[in-house]
Protein backbone atom coordinates (compact mmCIF):
# COMPACT_ATOMS: atom_id res chain seq x y z
CA UNK A 1 0.00 0.00 0.00
CA UNK A 2 1.38 3.35 -1.00
CA UNK A 3 1.26 5.80 1.87
CA UNK A 4 1.34 9.56 1.53
CA UNK A 5 2.14 11.70 4.52
CA UNK A 6 1.30 15.37 4.79
CA UNK A 7 2.64 17.06 7.91
CA UNK A 8 0.97 20.06 9.42
CA UNK A 9 2.95 21.77 12.16
CA UNK A 10 1.43 24.42 14.36
CA UNK A 11 4.00 26.23 16.46
CA UNK A 12 2.80 27.98 19.60
CA UNK A 13 5.15 30.34 21.31
CA UNK A 14 2.88 31.17 24.20
CA UNK A 15 2.09 29.09 27.27
CA UNK A 16 -1.32 30.33 28.31
CA UNK A 17 -2.04 31.05 31.95
CA UNK A 18 -5.44 32.27 30.76
CA UNK A 19 -7.69 31.07 27.99
CA UNK A 20 -11.31 30.96 26.83
CA UNK A 21 -13.89 28.86 28.63
CA UNK A 22 -17.09 28.03 26.75
CA UNK A 23 -20.06 29.23 28.81
CA UNK A 24 -22.95 28.67 26.39
CA UNK A 25 -23.85 27.92 22.79
CA UNK A 26 -27.12 28.95 21.15
CA UNK A 27 -28.59 28.56 17.67
CA UNK A 28 -30.69 31.73 17.15
CA UNK A 29 -33.46 32.32 14.59
CA UNK A 30 -31.29 34.58 12.41
CA UNK A 31 -28.71 32.81 10.25
CA UNK A 32 -25.26 33.81 9.05
CA UNK A 33 -24.66 36.11 12.01
CA UNK A 34 -22.71 39.18 10.89
CA UNK A 35 -22.22 41.63 13.79
CA UNK A 36 -22.72 42.09 17.54
CA UNK A 37 -23.72 45.28 19.37
CA UNK A 38 -24.03 45.58 23.16
CA UNK A 39 -25.94 48.46 24.74
CA UNK A 40 -26.62 48.06 28.45
CA UNK A 41 -27.97 44.56 29.01
CA UNK A 42 -29.26 44.24 25.46
CA UNK A 43 -27.26 42.50 22.74
CA UNK A 44 -28.26 42.89 19.09
CA UNK A 45 -27.12 40.51 16.34
CA UNK A 46 -28.08 40.99 12.68
CA UNK A 47 -28.19 38.03 10.33
CA UNK A 48 -27.56 37.92 6.63
CA UNK A 49 -30.67 35.74 6.58
CA UNK A 50 -33.84 35.66 8.67
CA UNK A 51 -33.71 39.00 10.45
CA UNK A 52 -32.16 40.57 13.52
CA UNK A 53 -32.03 39.02 17.01
CA UNK A 54 -32.28 40.73 20.42
CA UNK A 55 -30.85 39.14 23.58
CA UNK A 56 -30.90 39.86 27.31
CA UNK A 57 -27.36 39.53 28.72
CA UNK A 58 -28.06 40.59 32.30
CA UNK A 59 -26.59 37.15 33.02
CA UNK A 60 -23.51 37.52 30.79
CA UNK A 61 -22.80 33.78 30.79
CA UNK A 62 -26.14 32.87 29.29
CA UNK A 63 -27.66 35.23 26.69
CA UNK A 64 -31.45 34.87 26.61
CA UNK A 65 -33.13 35.35 23.26
CA UNK A 66 -35.88 37.98 23.53
CA UNK A 67 -37.10 38.57 19.99
CA UNK A 68 -36.41 38.48 16.28
CA UNK A 69 -37.50 41.10 13.76
CA UNK A 70 -37.51 40.70 10.00
CA UNK A 71 -37.51 43.85 7.88
CA UNK A 72 -39.36 42.98 4.66
CA UNK A 73 -37.45 43.09 1.37
CA UNK A 74 -39.31 41.40 -1.45
CA UNK A 75 -39.84 37.77 -0.53
CA UNK A 76 -37.19 37.70 2.21
CA UNK A 77 -35.84 39.68 5.14
CA UNK A 78 -33.41 42.55 4.63
CA UNK A 79 -29.93 41.30 5.45
CA UNK A 80 -27.95 42.96 8.23
CA UNK A 81 -24.16 43.28 8.21
CA UNK A 82 -23.45 45.91 10.89
CA UNK A 83 -25.45 47.45 13.70
CA UNK A 84 -24.94 50.40 16.05
CA UNK A 85 -27.37 51.60 18.70
CA UNK A 86 -28.01 54.70 20.78
CA UNK A 87 -30.55 54.77 23.59
CA UNK A 88 -33.33 52.51 22.27
CA UNK A 89 -32.78 52.97 18.53
CA UNK A 90 -30.66 50.61 16.40
CA UNK A 91 -29.27 51.39 12.95
CA UNK A 92 -28.59 48.43 10.64
CA UNK A 93 -26.60 48.50 7.41
CA UNK A 94 -26.76 46.05 4.55
CA UNK A 95 -24.84 45.39 1.37
CA UNK A 96 -28.20 45.02 -0.37
CA UNK A 97 -28.13 47.82 -2.92
CA UNK A 98 -31.17 50.07 -3.01
CA UNK A 99 -32.64 49.02 0.34
CA UNK A 100 -29.48 48.91 2.39
CA UNK A 101 -30.48 50.09 5.86
CA UNK A 102 -33.04 49.84 8.63
CA UNK A 103 -33.91 51.86 11.73
CA UNK A 104 -35.46 49.84 14.57
CA UNK A 105 -36.94 51.04 17.86
CA UNK A 106 -36.27 48.51 20.64
CA UNK A 107 -37.65 50.47 23.58
CA UNK A 108 -39.51 47.21 24.21
CA UNK A 109 -36.88 44.61 23.24
CA UNK A 110 -39.53 41.90 23.20
CA UNK A 111 -41.34 43.75 20.43
CA UNK A 112 -38.89 45.78 18.30
CA UNK A 113 -40.48 48.03 15.67
CA UNK A 114 -39.15 48.87 12.21
CA UNK A 115 -39.27 52.67 11.90
CA UNK A 116 -37.70 53.37 8.53
CA UNK A 117 -34.33 53.63 6.82
CA UNK A 118 -31.47 56.05 6.20
CA UNK A 119 -32.28 58.55 3.47
CA UNK A 120 -29.58 59.35 0.93
CA UNK A 121 -31.71 61.77 -1.05
CA UNK A 122 -29.52 64.45 -2.55
CA UNK A 123 -26.32 62.46 -2.04
CA UNK A 124 -25.93 61.80 -5.73
CA UNK A 125 -25.24 58.09 -5.24
CA UNK A 126 -26.97 55.20 -6.97
CA UNK A 127 -27.86 52.13 -4.91
CA UNK A 128 -24.93 52.24 -2.46
CA UNK A 129 -23.76 49.18 -0.53
CA UNK A 130 -23.59 50.09 3.17
CA UNK A 131 -21.12 48.55 5.60
CA UNK A 132 -19.52 49.64 8.91
CA UNK A 133 -21.16 52.07 11.35
CA UNK A 134 -20.15 54.19 14.33
CA UNK A 135 -21.97 56.59 16.65
CA UNK A 136 -20.60 59.51 18.65
CA UNK A 137 -23.02 61.78 20.50
CA UNK A 138 -25.53 62.93 17.85
CA UNK A 139 -23.53 61.69 14.83
CA UNK A 140 -23.87 58.44 12.88
CA UNK A 141 -21.09 57.55 10.44
CA UNK A 142 -21.71 54.99 7.68
CA UNK A 143 -19.11 53.38 5.41
CA UNK A 144 -20.35 52.75 1.88
CA UNK A 145 -17.56 51.07 -0.10
CA UNK A 146 -16.94 52.92 -3.40
CA UNK A 147 -19.37 55.67 -2.39
CA UNK A 148 -17.19 56.64 0.58
CA UNK A 149 -18.48 57.70 4.00
CA UNK A 150 -21.72 59.41 5.02
CA UNK A 151 -22.31 61.19 8.33
CA UNK A 152 -25.83 61.78 9.64
CA UNK A 153 -27.16 64.03 12.39
CA UNK A 154 -29.31 61.78 14.59
CA UNK A 155 -30.75 64.39 16.97
CA UNK A 156 -34.03 63.17 15.53
CA UNK A 157 -33.19 59.49 15.87
CA UNK A 158 -36.04 58.33 13.63
CA UNK A 159 -35.17 60.77 10.84
CA UNK A 160 -31.38 61.05 10.47
CA UNK A 161 -30.24 64.04 8.44
CA UNK A 162 -27.34 63.53 6.02
CA UNK A 163 -24.90 66.41 6.53
CA UNK A 164 -21.46 65.19 5.40
CA UNK A 165 -19.98 63.04 2.62
CA UNK A 166 -16.44 61.96 1.81
CA UNK A 167 -15.45 60.00 -1.28
CA UNK A 168 -12.84 57.22 -1.10
CA UNK A 169 -11.98 53.95 -2.81
CA UNK A 170 -13.58 51.17 -0.73
CA UNK A 171 -14.81 52.20 2.72
CA UNK A 172 -15.45 49.05 4.77
CA UNK A 173 -15.64 50.65 8.20
CA UNK A 174 -15.43 53.98 9.98
CA UNK A 175 -14.70 54.98 13.58
CA UNK A 176 -14.95 58.34 15.32
CA UNK A 177 -11.69 59.55 16.83
CA UNK A 178 -13.42 62.61 18.25
CA UNK A 179 -16.23 64.91 17.15
CA UNK A 180 -14.05 66.37 14.40
CA UNK A 181 -12.02 63.40 13.15
CA UNK A 182 -12.75 59.92 11.81
CA UNK A 183 -10.69 56.87 10.87
CA UNK A 184 -11.78 55.16 7.66
CA UNK A 185 -10.98 51.52 6.94
CA UNK A 186 -10.55 51.89 3.19
CA UNK A 187 -10.31 48.22 2.26
CA UNK A 188 -7.35 47.38 0.05
CA UNK A 189 -6.43 51.09 -0.04
CA UNK A 190 -5.48 51.17 3.65
CA UNK A 191 -6.47 53.75 6.25
CA UNK A 192 -7.53 57.38 6.14
CA UNK A 193 -7.39 59.68 9.17
CA UNK A 194 -9.68 62.54 8.28
CA UNK A 195 -10.67 65.92 9.69
CA UNK A 196 -14.37 66.36 8.93
CA UNK A 197 -14.75 70.05 9.74
CA UNK A 198 -12.19 72.82 9.44
CA UNK A 199 -12.13 76.60 9.20
CA UNK A 200 -9.62 76.60 6.35
CA UNK A 201 -10.00 74.20 3.43
CA UNK A 202 -8.76 71.63 2.70
CA UNK A 203 -9.23 69.70 5.93
CA UNK A 204 -6.29 67.59 7.09
CA UNK A 205 -6.07 64.05 5.77
CA UNK A 206 -3.50 61.32 6.45
CA UNK A 207 -3.36 58.14 4.35
CA UNK A 208 -1.72 54.96 5.66
CA UNK A 209 -0.78 51.98 3.49
CA UNK A 210 -1.61 48.75 5.28
CA UNK A 211 -0.28 45.23 4.88
CA UNK A 212 -3.76 43.79 4.29
CA UNK A 213 -7.22 44.94 3.26
CA UNK A 214 -8.88 46.78 6.16
CA UNK A 215 -12.11 45.16 7.42
CA UNK A 216 -12.67 46.77 10.84
CA UNK A 217 -11.28 49.70 12.85
CA UNK A 218 -11.67 50.39 16.58
CA UNK A 219 -10.34 53.45 18.43
CA UNK A 220 -9.48 53.90 22.10
CA UNK A 221 -7.25 56.41 23.91
CA UNK A 222 -5.08 57.44 20.92
CA UNK A 223 -4.74 53.80 19.80
CA UNK A 224 -6.25 52.53 16.56
CA UNK A 225 -6.73 48.76 16.24
CA UNK A 226 -7.18 47.51 12.68
CA UNK A 227 -8.41 44.13 11.39
CA UNK A 228 -6.71 43.43 8.07
CA UNK A 229 -8.14 40.09 6.96
CA UNK A 230 -5.38 37.64 6.05
CA UNK A 231 -2.74 40.13 7.32
CA UNK A 232 -4.04 39.92 10.89
CA UNK A 233 -4.20 42.81 13.37
CA UNK A 234 -2.33 46.11 13.30
CA UNK A 235 -2.04 48.64 16.13
CA UNK A 236 -1.27 52.33 15.54
CA UNK A 237 -0.51 55.22 17.85
CA UNK A 238 -2.48 58.11 16.32
CA UNK A 239 -1.95 60.68 19.08
CA UNK A 240 -0.45 62.78 16.28
CA UNK A 241 -2.95 62.34 13.45
CA UNK A 242 -0.51 63.63 10.87
CA UNK A 243 2.26 61.24 11.94
CA UNK A 244 0.72 57.89 12.97
CA UNK A 245 3.10 55.23 14.29
CA UNK A 246 2.69 51.50 13.58
CA UNK A 247 3.29 49.88 16.97
CA UNK A 248 2.91 46.24 15.92
CA UNK A 249 1.40 43.88 13.35
CA UNK A 250 0.24 40.43 14.48
CA UNK A 251 -0.44 37.67 11.94
CA UNK A 252 -3.47 35.83 13.30
CA UNK A 253 -3.07 33.07 10.66
CA UNK A 254 -6.79 33.16 9.85
CA UNK A 255 -9.02 35.89 8.43
CA UNK A 256 -9.24 38.74 10.95
CA UNK A 257 -12.66 40.14 10.14
CA UNK A 258 -13.97 42.02 13.17
CA UNK A 259 -12.51 43.03 16.53
CA UNK A 260 -13.68 44.13 19.97
CA UNK A 261 -11.68 45.96 22.65
CA UNK A 262 -11.89 45.12 26.35
CA UNK A 263 -9.89 45.23 29.55
CA UNK A 264 -7.95 48.36 28.64
CA UNK A 265 -5.30 46.68 26.49
CA UNK A 266 -6.90 43.57 25.01
CA UNK A 267 -8.56 42.90 21.68
CA UNK A 268 -10.82 39.97 20.79
CA UNK A 269 -10.57 38.87 17.16
CA UNK A 270 -13.04 36.96 15.01
CA UNK A 271 -10.54 35.01 12.94
CA UNK A 272 -12.87 32.80 10.85
CA UNK A 273 -12.28 29.38 12.44
CA UNK A 274 -11.31 30.60 15.88
CA UNK A 275 -11.48 33.39 18.43
CA UNK A 276 -8.19 34.96 19.46
CA UNK A 277 -7.35 37.29 22.34
CA UNK A 278 -4.39 39.63 21.87
CA UNK A 279 -2.90 41.88 24.54
CA UNK A 280 -0.84 45.02 24.00
CA UNK A 281 2.07 44.68 26.42
CA UNK A 282 3.46 48.15 25.73
CA UNK A 283 5.98 46.75 23.27
CA UNK A 284 4.05 44.15 21.22
CA UNK A 285 0.74 42.45 20.56
CA UNK A 286 0.87 39.10 22.33
CA UNK A 287 -1.44 36.10 21.92
CA UNK A 288 -2.88 35.40 25.38
CA UNK A 289 -5.81 33.15 24.57
CA UNK A 290 -7.67 31.42 21.76
CA UNK A 291 -10.39 28.89 21.07
CA UNK A 292 -10.75 26.99 17.82
CA UNK A 293 -14.51 26.99 17.22
CA UNK A 294 -14.63 25.44 13.75
CA UNK A 295 -17.89 27.28 13.16
CA UNK A 296 -17.02 30.33 11.01
CA UNK A 297 -16.61 33.14 13.50
CA UNK A 298 -17.94 36.17 11.63
CA UNK A 299 -18.14 38.88 14.30
CA UNK A 300 -17.33 39.48 17.94
CA UNK A 301 -18.16 41.61 20.96
CA UNK A 302 -16.71 41.84 24.46
CA UNK A 303 -17.89 43.10 27.82
CA UNK A 304 -15.67 42.76 30.85
CA UNK A 305 -14.20 39.25 30.54
CA UNK A 306 -17.04 37.84 28.41
CA UNK A 307 -16.58 37.31 24.68
CA UNK A 308 -19.54 36.84 22.34
CA UNK A 309 -18.72 35.04 19.10
CA UNK A 310 -21.29 35.46 16.30
CA UNK A 311 -20.89 32.60 13.88
CA UNK A 312 -22.49 31.23 10.73
CA UNK A 313 -25.20 29.46 12.75
CA UNK A 314 -24.29 29.80 16.42
CA UNK A 315 -23.81 32.37 19.13
CA UNK A 316 -21.10 31.20 21.52
CA UNK A 317 -20.25 32.86 24.83
CA UNK A 318 -16.75 32.55 26.25
CA UNK A 319 -15.17 33.74 29.48
CA UNK A 320 -11.57 34.91 29.30
CA UNK A 321 -9.57 34.12 32.43
CA UNK A 322 -7.73 31.49 34.42
CA UNK A 323 -8.83 27.91 33.72
CA UNK A 324 -8.28 25.68 36.73
CA UNK A 325 -9.67 22.60 34.96
CA UNK A 326 -8.40 20.72 31.93
CA UNK A 327 -8.97 22.63 28.70
CA UNK A 328 -8.58 20.91 25.34
CA UNK A 329 -7.95 22.75 22.09
CA UNK A 330 -7.54 21.10 18.69
CA UNK A 331 -6.08 22.51 15.49
CA UNK A 332 -9.04 21.65 13.24
CA UNK A 333 -12.71 20.68 13.49
CA UNK A 334 -12.84 19.69 9.82
CA UNK A 335 -10.40 17.32 8.12
CA UNK A 336 -10.72 16.85 4.35
CA UNK A 337 -8.44 14.56 2.35
CA UNK A 338 -7.37 15.13 -1.28
CA UNK A 339 -8.14 12.82 -4.20
CA UNK A 340 -6.36 9.46 -3.84
CA UNK A 341 -5.89 6.32 -5.90
CA UNK A 342 -7.77 3.23 -4.77
CA UNK A 343 -6.05 1.61 -1.79
CA UNK A 344 -3.69 4.50 -1.06
CA UNK A 345 -3.67 6.52 2.16
CA UNK A 346 -3.17 10.02 3.42
CA UNK A 347 -2.50 11.24 6.96
CA UNK A 348 -3.37 14.49 8.71
CA UNK A 349 -1.63 15.52 11.93
CA UNK A 350 -4.16 16.89 14.41
CA UNK A 351 -2.59 19.04 17.10
CA UNK A 352 -4.12 18.49 20.55
CA UNK A 353 -3.33 20.85 23.44
CA UNK A 354 -4.16 21.08 27.11
CA UNK A 355 -4.37 24.81 27.81
CA UNK A 356 -5.84 24.34 31.27
CA UNK A 357 -4.15 23.96 34.64
CA UNK A 358 -5.31 20.39 35.35
CA UNK A 359 -4.32 17.12 33.60
CA UNK A 360 -6.39 16.22 30.54
CA UNK A 361 -7.71 12.67 30.28
CA UNK A 362 -8.81 11.43 26.85
CA UNK A 363 -10.77 8.42 25.63
CA UNK A 364 -9.77 6.78 22.35
CA UNK A 365 -11.86 8.53 19.68
CA UNK A 366 -14.81 6.83 18.05
CA UNK A 367 -15.22 7.03 14.28
CA UNK A 368 -18.39 6.50 12.25
CA UNK A 369 -16.68 5.26 9.04
CA UNK A 370 -14.14 2.44 8.82
CA UNK A 371 -12.04 4.07 6.07
CA UNK A 372 -10.64 6.41 8.75
CA UNK A 373 -8.39 5.48 11.67
CA UNK A 374 -6.33 7.27 14.31
CA UNK A 375 -2.89 6.49 15.73
CA UNK A 376 -0.68 8.14 18.35
CA UNK A 377 -3.74 9.44 20.17
CA UNK A 378 -2.89 10.48 23.76
CA UNK A 379 -4.65 9.15 26.84
CA UNK A 380 -3.24 11.74 29.25
CA UNK A 381 -1.78 15.23 28.89
CA UNK A 382 -0.21 17.49 31.48
CA UNK A 383 -1.11 21.19 31.66
CA UNK A 384 0.49 23.16 28.78
CA UNK A 385 1.33 19.92 26.96
CA UNK A 386 0.65 19.49 23.24
CA UNK A 387 0.91 16.49 20.96
CA UNK A 388 0.03 15.48 17.40
CA UNK A 389 -2.35 12.59 16.71
CA UNK A 390 -2.38 11.08 13.22
CA UNK A 391 -5.75 10.83 11.48
CA UNK A 392 -5.49 8.61 8.38
CA UNK A 393 -7.76 7.78 5.48
CA UNK A 394 -7.46 4.88 3.03
CA UNK A 395 -9.51 5.11 -0.14
CA UNK A 396 -11.92 2.25 -0.80
CA UNK A 397 -14.90 1.86 -3.11
CA UNK A 398 -17.14 3.56 -0.52
CA UNK A 399 -18.17 7.21 -0.39
CA UNK A 400 -16.25 8.33 2.68
CA UNK A 401 -17.41 10.92 5.17
CA UNK A 402 -17.79 10.56 8.88
CA UNK A 403 -17.46 11.96 12.37
CA UNK A 404 -14.67 11.52 14.90
CA UNK A 405 -15.87 11.99 18.48
CA UNK A 406 -13.25 13.02 21.03
CA UNK A 407 -14.28 12.68 24.69
CA UNK A 408 -12.29 14.15 27.58
CA UNK A 409 -12.57 15.52 31.11
CA UNK A 410 -12.68 19.09 29.76
CA UNK A 411 -15.80 20.31 31.63
CA UNK A 412 -16.99 22.93 29.14
CA UNK A 413 -16.49 20.75 26.05
CA UNK A 414 -16.53 17.09 27.16
CA UNK A 415 -17.29 15.93 23.60
CA UNK A 416 -15.91 17.40 20.37
CA UNK A 417 -17.08 16.21 16.97
CA UNK A 418 -14.61 16.49 14.09
CA UNK A 419 -15.97 16.26 10.55
CA UNK A 420 -14.00 13.84 8.33
CA UNK A 421 -14.26 13.93 4.54
CA UNK A 422 -12.53 11.39 2.31
CA UNK A 423 -13.18 10.67 -1.36
CA UNK A 424 -16.66 10.49 -2.82
CA UNK A 425 -18.51 10.71 -6.12
CA UNK A 426 -18.34 14.28 -7.37
CA UNK A 427 -15.90 17.17 -7.29
CA UNK A 428 -12.85 16.64 -5.05
CA UNK A 429 -9.83 18.87 -4.66
CA UNK A 430 -7.04 17.38 -6.75
CA UNK A 431 -9.05 15.80 -9.58
CA UNK A 432 -9.46 17.17 -13.09
CA UNK A 433 -12.57 19.28 -13.54
CA UNK A 434 -14.83 18.54 -16.51
CA UNK A 435 -15.25 21.22 -19.16
CA UNK A 436 -18.13 23.62 -18.49
CA UNK A 437 -19.55 26.99 -19.56
CA UNK A 438 -21.66 29.29 -17.38
CA UNK A 439 -23.15 32.75 -17.93
CA UNK A 440 -21.40 35.58 -16.04
CA UNK A 441 -24.04 37.38 -13.98
CA UNK A 442 -21.85 39.79 -11.96
CA UNK A 443 -18.52 41.59 -12.41
CA UNK A 444 -18.59 41.10 -16.16
CA UNK A 445 -20.64 39.84 -19.09
CA UNK A 446 -20.66 36.93 -21.49
CA UNK A 447 -19.83 33.32 -20.68
CA UNK A 448 -17.16 31.74 -18.51
CA UNK A 449 -15.65 28.64 -20.17
CA UNK A 450 -13.18 26.60 -18.15
CA UNK A 451 -10.82 25.77 -21.03
CA UNK A 452 -10.29 29.49 -21.69
CA UNK A 453 -8.53 29.81 -18.33
CA UNK A 454 -6.18 26.82 -18.21
CA UNK A 455 -3.14 27.51 -16.04
CA UNK A 456 -4.80 30.46 -14.32
CA UNK A 457 -5.95 30.83 -10.73
CA UNK A 458 -9.67 31.58 -10.89
CA UNK A 459 -12.12 32.21 -8.05
CA UNK A 460 -15.75 31.52 -8.94
CA UNK A 461 -18.58 32.51 -6.59
CA UNK A 462 -21.87 30.60 -6.81
CA UNK A 463 -24.96 32.04 -5.12
CA UNK A 464 -28.33 30.47 -4.40
CA UNK A 465 -31.43 31.97 -2.78
CA UNK A 466 -31.39 31.73 1.02
Residue ranges and their predicted role:
Residues 5-17:
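Hydrophobic h-region of N-terminal signal peptides that target proteins for export
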Residues 18-323:
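Feature marking well-ordered beta-strand scaffolds used for ligand recognition
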Residues 322-428:
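Feature for long, exposed domains in two main contexts
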Residues 421-451:
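N-terminal "domain-start" segment that seeds a small globular fold
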Residues 448-466:
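Short active-site neighborhood of thiol/selenol oxidoreductases, capturing the structured segment around
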Amino acid sequence: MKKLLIHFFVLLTVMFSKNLTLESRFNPPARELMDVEIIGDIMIIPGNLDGYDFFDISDPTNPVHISNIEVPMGNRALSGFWVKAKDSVAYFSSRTRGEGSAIVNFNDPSDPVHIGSLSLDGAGVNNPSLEGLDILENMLAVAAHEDGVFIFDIDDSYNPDLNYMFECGNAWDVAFIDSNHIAIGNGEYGLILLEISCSIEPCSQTTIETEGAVKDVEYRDSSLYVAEGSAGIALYDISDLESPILLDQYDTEGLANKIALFGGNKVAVSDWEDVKILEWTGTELELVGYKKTGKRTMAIAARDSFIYSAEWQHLQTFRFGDINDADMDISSWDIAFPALEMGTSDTFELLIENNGQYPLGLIAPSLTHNDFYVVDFPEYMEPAESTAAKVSYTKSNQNASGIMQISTNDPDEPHIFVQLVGNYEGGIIGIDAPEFSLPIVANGTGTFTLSDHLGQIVVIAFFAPG
